[in-house]
Amino acid sequence: MYRGSMVALVTPMKADGSLDWDALHKLIDWHLEQGTHAIVAVGTTGESATLNMAEHLEVISKVVDQVNGRVPVIAGTGANSTSEALELTQGAKQAKADACLLVTPYYNKPSQEGLYQHYCYLAREVAIPQFLYNVPGRTAVDMLPETVARLATVENIVGIKDATASMERLQQMQALTDDSFIFLSGDDATSVDFMALGGHGEISVTANVVPAQTAKICELALAGNVEQARELDRPLAPLHEALFLEANPVPVKWAMARMGFLDGALRLPLTPLNAVYHAQLEAAMLSAGAI
């Protein structure tokens, strides 16, 4: 169920900062037409950090309603407060999301035991499939393989999104968990290698821009056709890089605006992509066949 290309969906906004529901609905339908295997709503790319609680839950609800069971919906419900993560996760279950994605608590830098207790509490309190999410470059905390292994035995915890871009880390976690635990890449540039080593798919920023290509790459890699997947991925390499010229989702929103899907608005403290990067990102989009 949780395999392949899972788009880390942007949250469209209008110039006044309000949420653009029409653009959101059109994006979802486009992704389903293009073959995206799952929708991840209100994660990092979906600007969860600048949505209030009501908006966060409303986006989840509207995504679930628009998808209407056609593919799985994974709701981002992580927070650096366990009580807030609980409220979001409960709301996602009520909205009938298929699963939740919970980033490690950021800024307050919990210990490994703190991480373990945080996730155990959420898994115990809300009966919905839950994915751990380790992205130390953003959170200032790294969930170690031994902690992942402890959590992999907890009911309702089904897998992890790993954004370390380390194949060694993937293999360490695989060695400590059983075959039922799901590994999803959180790094587009290394996702083919990740799947070649037994990963189950990726939660992709690049899929916002080239969903059909990303889905096909995942299908090939998961079928064991790794060299074909690499060949198809090669023209996307400049795009993988360019989408992080500034903090995600600043570049991807510029790209989506360039494609005509939304106006590219962001909420402070994020600001539009610096003009010095426009040509590089546009060239990467051309290389990838996005425009």
Swiss-Prot record:
The protein's annotated pathway: Amino-acid biosynthesis; L-lysine biosynthesis via DAP pathway; (S)-tetrahydrodipicolinate from L-aspartate: step 3/4
Localization (cell): Cytoplasm
Domain of life: Bacteria
Biological process, per Gene Ontology: diaminopimelate biosynthetic process; lysine biosynthetic process via diaminopimelate
Catalytic reaction equation(s): L-aspartate 4-semialdehyde + pyruvate = (2S,4S)-4-hydroxy-2,3,4,5-tetrahydrodipicolinate + H2O + H(+)
Coiled coil feature spans: none
Pfam families reported in the protein's UniProt record: DHDPS
EC supergroup of this enzyme: lyase
GO molecular function: 4-hydroxy-tetrahydrodipicolinate synthase activity
Protein family membership: Belongs to the DapA family.
Role of this protein: Catalyzes the condensation of (S)-aspartate-beta-semialdehyde [(S)-ASA] and pyruvate to 4-hydroxy-tetrahydrodipicolinate (HTPA).
Identification of the protein by name: 4-hydroxy-tetrahydrodipicolinate synthase
Source organism of this protein record: Teredinibacter turnerae (strain ATCC 39867 / T7901)
Lineage of source species: Bacteria, Pseudomonadati, Pseudomonadota, Gammaproteobacteria, Cellvibrionales
